[in-house]
């Protein structure tokens, strides 16, 4: 696993070097099935299905030569004006974990209530770094694809579909444009004035925050491609 490590100078020319010092473990399963369910003189149907699942683990971030004392790395970036890392990867943990404050409610003044390190409610104004926790994972646990090909006389039809399941996404547009404080900075989504947790809208002085409220399920199933053809004879 590649990461930037602090090194001594000399012998190295620079104080930081990109090195492949980490160790990653992946365990998974892939299944592929194909069949011709129907085949006659004028009509045929060929189908294939693929399924895969994978579980990863960051075994180590350091080796004998390159050391990372923290035991974790932070990656992803919200950008201005929030300016926070979105992911933290621990030794012994999974890659792709969203790491931040877990919102559990909103108070009567429209300010977030988060869960502290012990699982108790706390106003977000009293947030501490140790209150952050894993709030989702952006890597799909299940990947599927289904391809179908049909022929009828000189006509042919192909349909390709795929899906990904059991993973999360960070909804950036909502995180930035669903907070009334942004009205003085630009546009807002219509949902900015919808009650949060069924109670009240966000306070127009509530600063933009990277919190679990904007983490959503990313599950999808879509048609990637449809082709129709005719063969001249």
Cite the ranges covered by each PLM segment.
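Membrane-embedded beta-barrel scaffold of Gram-negative outer-membrane proteins
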Residues: 1-12, 45, 50-52
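Outer-membrane beta-barrel and related beta-rich outer-membrane complex signature
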Residues: 2-6, 56-72, 76, 167-191, ...
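Flexible, solvent-exposed coil segments and beta strand-coil junctions
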Residues: 5-16, 120-130, 200-212
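Transmembrane beta-barrel architecture of outer-membrane proteins
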Residues: 16, 26-30, 44, 141-145, ...
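Conserved small-residue
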Residues: 19-25, 29, 36-137
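Transmembrane beta-strands of outer-membrane beta-barrel pores
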Residues: 25, 35-37, 51-57, 152-154, ...
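Repeated loop/turn-to-beta-strand initiation elements of outer-membrane beta-barrel proteins
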Residues: 41, 154-159
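Extracytoplasmic gating/loop element in the C-terminal half of outer-membrane beta-barrel translocons
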Residues: 164-233
């Amino acid at each position: 696993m590649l990461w930037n490590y602090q090194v001594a100078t000399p012998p190295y020319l620079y104080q930081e070097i990109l090195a492949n010092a980490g160790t990653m473990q992946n365990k998974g399963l892939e299944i592929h099935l194909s069949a011709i369910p129907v085949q006659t003189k004028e009509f045929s149907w060929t189908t294939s299905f693929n399924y895969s699942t994978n579980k990863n683990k960051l075994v180590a971030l350091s080796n004998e030569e390159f050391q990372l004392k923290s035991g974790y790395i932070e990656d992803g970036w919200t950008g201005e004006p929030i300016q926070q890392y979105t992911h933290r990867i621990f030794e012994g943990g999974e890659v792709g974990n969203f790491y931040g404050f877990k919102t559990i409610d909103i108070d009567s003044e429209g300010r977030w209530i988060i869960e502290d390190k012990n699982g108790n409610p706390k106003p977000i104004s009293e947030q501490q770094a140790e209150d952050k926790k894993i709030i989702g994972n952006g890597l799909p646990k299940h990947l599927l694809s289904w391809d179908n090909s049909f022929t009828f006389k000189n006509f042919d039809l192909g349909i390709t579909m795929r899906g990904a399941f059991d993973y999360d996404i960070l909804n950036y547009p909502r995180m930035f444009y669903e907070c009334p404080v942004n009205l003085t900075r630009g546009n807002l989504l219509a949902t900015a004035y919808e009650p949060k947790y069924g109670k009240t809208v966000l306070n127009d002085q509530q600063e933009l925050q990277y919190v679990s409220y904007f983490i959503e399920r990313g599950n999808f199933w879509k048609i990637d491609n449809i082709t129709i053809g005719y063969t001249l004879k």
